[in-house]
């Protein structure tokens, strides 16, 4: 359900355990998590617009017994993580956690203490933290290598180039076949046995 639009805005999700979100502000319209992601890509051009858009809706998670959190990034280099805790939307920007410019997430809440029910994915998060500590620009192929290093029952791995409007995808931990999509060529898919 991840995606990218023609403005260079991308949104990705990761599953969390427990704490299904059902907001109920009577002054807001309701939206489900799957529709929300498509709507963000349809109506927003950058991270700021996406956050403003999300603030206008009550979110309702579709997956029973679990929640999702989201990483949103744009072609200007802006990014934000969105988490819902106690039915409140929280934003996490670069430098707010770990004092690094990269935002990365796995399958645990960043805005909750580590403990029972919130440690799934911590091992992979710590690998990401270690590998990104030098705070350097990463080439696309190296980004996919990093995703390979932290895979664990991964359904898909995506690397976005938000300036070129492309995404390279590996499915079900099969890193011997890559699918490359270009937003400007929606009916084409390049299949390759190497990243490039």
Q: Across the structure, where does each feature detected by a protein language model lie?
A:
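C-terminal, well-structured catalytic/ligand-binding subdomain of enzymes
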Residues: 2-43, 48, 53, 65-68, ...
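Sec/Tat-exported extracytoplasmic proteins
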Residues: 44, 58-61
């Amino acid at each position: 359900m991840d995606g990218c639009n023609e403005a260079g805005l991308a949104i990705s999700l990761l599953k969390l355990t427990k704490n299904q979100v059902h907001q109920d502000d009577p002054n807001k319209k309701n939206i489900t998590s799957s529709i929300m992601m498509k709507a963000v890509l349809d109506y927003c051009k950058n991270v700021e617009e996406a956050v403003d858009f999300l603030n206008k809706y009550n979110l309702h998670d579709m997956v029973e017994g679990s929640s999702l959190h989201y990483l949103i990034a744009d072609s200007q280099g802006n990014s934000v993580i969105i988490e819902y805790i106690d039915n409140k939307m929280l934003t996490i920007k670069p430098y707010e956690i770990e004092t690094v410019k990269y935002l990365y997430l796995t399958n645990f809440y960043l805005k909750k203490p580590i403990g029972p029910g919130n440690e799934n994915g911590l091992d992979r998060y710590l690998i990401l933290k270690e590998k990104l500590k030098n705070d350097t620009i990463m080439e696309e192929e190296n980004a996919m290598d990093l995703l390979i290093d932290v895979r664990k029952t991964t359904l898909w791995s995506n690397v976005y180039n938000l300036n070129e409007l492309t995404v390279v995808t590996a499915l079900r931990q099969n890193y011997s076949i890559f699918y490359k999509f270009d937003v400007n060529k929606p009916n084409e898919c390049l299949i390759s046995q190497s990243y490039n």
